[in-house]
Amino acid sequence: MNIDSLLAISPIDGRYSNKCTELQEIFSEFGLIKRRVLVECTWLKALAAEPKIRECKMTAAQVKAVDKVVANFSLADAQRVKDIEKTTNHDVKAVEYFLKEKLAKTFNSNTSNSKTQTILEFIHFGCTSEDINNMSHALMLRDGQKVLRGAMDGMTKIIAQMAKKYAKVPMLAPSGRPSPSSRPSPSEGRPCRRAA
């Protein structure tokens, strides 16, 4: 969906969007829905791995199918969640229904319909929407931090190289006002140490 940059919520998704493309997948609504799917699927697999919950036992093929839903999550999948949300009026419930719909198709070819239905009822079992949202937002922050950290590390290296390269070059008016000539001080390298 293209929007006019003048209608963007902030300059980050407007005029600077081409500089933040890596962050769009993470912090967009698509990114939130994708991470909700990841959290729900991880929880389902954890329940299936618990020996005391025999009703939720999944085959290796079913676990792979759950992993595949997460790995192949697409814009079309996110749109399907949004379509379901129009009926449910609940964003996290829409993710739950999407997963039941998606996994039912895969599971039914491998197991009996009643066994499939029992497993699918464990999606979101024992969770609140807040549980799913808290984890999803934490994953968004973690993934965003990885992207930003990489950019900051690159910038830090450039500043450190420039501080060394220009250490003996005199500067004129470093404060924007006439002053006696000076040289870059060790403080020019401090931002590098702070960012590291």
Role assignments for model-derived ranges:
Residues 1-196:
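A helix-coil-helix interface module used to build multimeric assemblies
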